[in-house]
C-alpha cells in the first residue's frame, strides 16, 4: 500500500504542470439583478461584501475585472454594456433595437476605455456570473456569434467566435424564475 501512495506522489510531482494548468485569461465578474459595480457602494462589494473577492483573486495572481451593468436592465442591454466595458469604445445598443424601443442608441458619457482591449479569439476571457449575471453572460456569448445585417454597432455588425473561454454561473435561473409571478 505504501508503494502505491509513493508512486501516486511521484506521478503528481512530475506531471503537476499538466494536472494543474495555470489560467492565463482574464476573469470577468458580472453581477445579478439589483447588483452594483465596484465603485457604487463604497467599501461594500457585490462580489464579497466586506471582503473584496476581486482583490483576493488578484493577490492570488489572477487578472480579474468587475463590470457594472444596469441592475434592472434586460439581459440584451447588460450584455452589450458588458462588451463595451471589456473591449472599450462608445456604447452602442444597435440601430434596430434603439429605433424599435425609442431609446438612445449611443448614450452620452458611455465611452469606455476598456478593461481588456486585447480581447479577441487569441485572448479570450472567462466569465463568472451570479444570478442574472449568468444569463447576461449567455446573452453576450449569443451576441458575439450573431452578425446582424445593416447594423453599425461594432458588436452587432461582426461575428466574434472563440472570444469566451468559459462561462461559470452561480445561482443563475437558466430556466426562468418563480419570482416573476410573485412580482406581478
Task: Name every feature range the model reports, one short phrase each.
Residues 3, 45-47, 162, 181:
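Hydrophobic transmembrane signal anchors and adjacent membrane-proximal interface regions, especially
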Residues 7, 18, 70, 115, ...:
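Short, flexible coil/linker segments at or flanking structured domains
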Residues 31, 83-86, 90-184:
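Serine-dependent carboxylesterase/thioesterase catalytic core
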Amino acid at each position: 500500500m505504501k508503494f502505491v501512495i509513493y508512486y501516486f506522489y511521484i506521478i503528481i510531482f512530475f506531471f503537476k504542470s499538466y494536472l494543474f494548468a495555470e489560467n492565463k485569461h482574464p476573469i470577468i465578474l458580472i453581477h445579478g439583478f439589483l447588483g452594483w459595480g465596484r465603485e457604487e457602494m463604497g467599501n461594500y462589494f457585490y462580489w464579497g461584501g466586506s471582503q473584496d473577492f476581486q482583490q483576493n483573486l488578484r493577490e492570488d495572481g489572477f487578472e480579474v475585472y468587475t463590470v457594472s451593468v444596469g441592475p434592472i436592465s434586460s439581459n440584451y442591454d447588460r450584455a452589450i454594456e458588458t462588451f463595451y466595458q471589456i473591449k472599450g469604445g462608445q456604447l452602442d445598443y444597435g440601430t434596430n433595437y434603439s429605433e424599435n424601443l425609442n431609446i438612445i442608441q449611443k448614450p452620452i458619457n458611455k465611452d469606455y476605455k476598456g478593461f481588456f482591449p486585447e480581447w479577441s479569439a487569441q485572448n479570450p476571457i472567462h466569465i463568472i456570473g451570479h444570478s442574472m449575471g449568468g444569463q447576461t453572460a449567455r446573452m453576450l456569448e449569443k451576441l458575439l456569434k450573431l452578425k446582424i445585417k445593416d447594423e453599425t454597432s461594432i458588436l452587432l455588425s461582426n461575428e466574434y467566435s472563440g472570444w469566451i473561454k468559459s462561462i461559470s454561473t452561480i445561482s443563475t435561473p437558466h430556466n426562468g424564475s418563480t419570482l416573476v409571478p410573485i412580482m406581478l
